[in-house]
From Swiss-Prot:
Catalytic activity: a quinone + succinate = fumarate + a quinol; (R)-malate + a quinone = enol-oxaloacetate + a quinol; (S)-malate + a quinone = enol-oxaloacetate + a quinol
Residues the entry annotates as binding [4Fe-4S] cluster: C185, C188, C191, C252
Domain 2Fe-2S ferredoxin-type, first and last residues per copy: 39-129
Top-level enzyme category: oxidoreductase
Keyword set, alphabetical order: 2Fe-2S, 3Fe-4S, 4Fe-4S, Electron transport, Iron, Iron-sulfur, Membrane, Metal-binding, Mitochondrion, Mitochondrion inner membrane, Oxidoreductase, Transit peptide, Transport, Tricarboxylic acid cycle
Pathway field: Carbohydrate metabolism; tricarboxylic acid cycle; fumarate from succinate (eukaryal route): step 1/1
Entries under NCBIfam families matching the protein: dhsB (TIGR00384), PRK05950.1 (NF004616)
Entry's EC annotation: 1.3.5.1, 1.1.5.-
Superkingdom of source: Eukaryota
Protein name: Succinate dehydrogenase [ubiquinone] iron-sulfur subunit, mitochondrial
Residues annotated as transmembrane: none
Amino acid sequence: MAAVCFSLSRCCSAVHRPAVTAVRFAQTAAAPAAQPRIKKFQIYRWDPDTVGDKPRMQTYEIDLNTCGPMVLDALIKIKNEMDSTLTFRRSCREGICGSCAMNINGGNTLACLNKIDTNTSKVTKIYPLPHMYVVKDLVPDMSNFYAQYKSIEPYLKKKDESQQGKQQYLQSVEDRQKLDGLYECILCACCSTSCPSYWWNADKYLGPAVLMQAYRWMIDSRDDFTEDRLSKLQDPFSLYRCHTIMNCTRTCPKGLNPGKAIAEIKKMMVTYKQKDAVAA
């Protein structure tokens, strides 16, 4: 019993004994400064509202150590810290809105998804989307593109509108899957402005982006106006200026295939014309 009490007393005394903390002194020093990584960006500049202003390339230098990884990060840094007159479109910074579509190092893409080439010996060249009127600097005039999109009536159309807004228009899983690879288009116009046929016939040829959206509604099982949509593409230009160059598919920043969608419309058009001929 005495041994137990002695053991408990030792434990209690150990609990109340002040702790001894070893303090180690170390000399601190600032982290060594990172070597500057200066990257040159040549950016298309032009303000048509300024009398005498002519298109030119303007060079900016950025330390990549103080900039985000994407080309859009560099553009925002230039505008915020170097030249507030630089004009470009941007919004989501996540490849969702399509606002920052431009031509970077010769290819149409989204600035928010395009990584800066860290090779500082190479200059990054940035232009607006090709073969479109320029509003200012990197901002193209999208008016014609949006007018063409509006012309295909990109929305669900029903012949019987008596139940409109009263019930859901259901479709099978299989029918819904047919829309995959079509509805994801963000209308950035990268594909259309990479298409030589669209360059020369933009006033008549609808272009890859708009035609892919037309196809999206043609094959929607809930839509009742497929034949009407096909009938509007019978002229020699709206659809048939596509020569399967496939620049559209190669350049799409969302990985979609407008070229395939156009080919499917052409196949549907054959059946439609045959049916139309029989009816006549």
